Amino acid sequence: MERELNAHEKQTLLAIARQAIIVGVQSGQEYVEPREEKTLNQRNGCFVTIKQNGQLRGCIGNFQSELPLFKEVAQMAQASAAKDPRFYPLKEEDLDNFNLEISVLSPLQKTEDIDEIEVGKHGIYIEKSFYRGVLLPQVATEHKWDRQTFLKQTCIKAGLPTDAWEADDADIYVFSAQVFGEEITK
């Protein structure tokens, strides 16, 4: 991003994500709310995370996008609600009991030196053969992981052995994210 999102822009994206989920669950239709703000029209990757009762309920995103950020957020919100294969799709009765978190991503940067990975700042994306796995920066912080554990858990997410990141044919990428979310509701 050219600059950090301000509080109003963050609230706007959270509102777009929430409305996209509601429209998607209730009608199956896409939701688009055109925006004029320059930062909301930039092409950035993002992930939208849905939590219910403090537990992960869906998380889908892209590292890069051909769409303006506001459209990408709406699409990833609907995908998180309906297409995360780890969870059943949100239903109408779920619509008053979920919280959102949005991660707006920097471009991926390949790293050869794991000492460059800063827990709490970087997310990790690992590729090896046909396997891929990603963990967002906040995951390591939430679980109080060190760098080694973060790498091992990213390998597990990719379906790889925990030491796969050490292989010569494994590619490790880092990225940062501007992460913001809704207040937790009861």
Question: Where would I find each of the regions flagged by the language model?
Answer:
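Basic nucleic-acid-binding interfaces
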Residues: 1-186
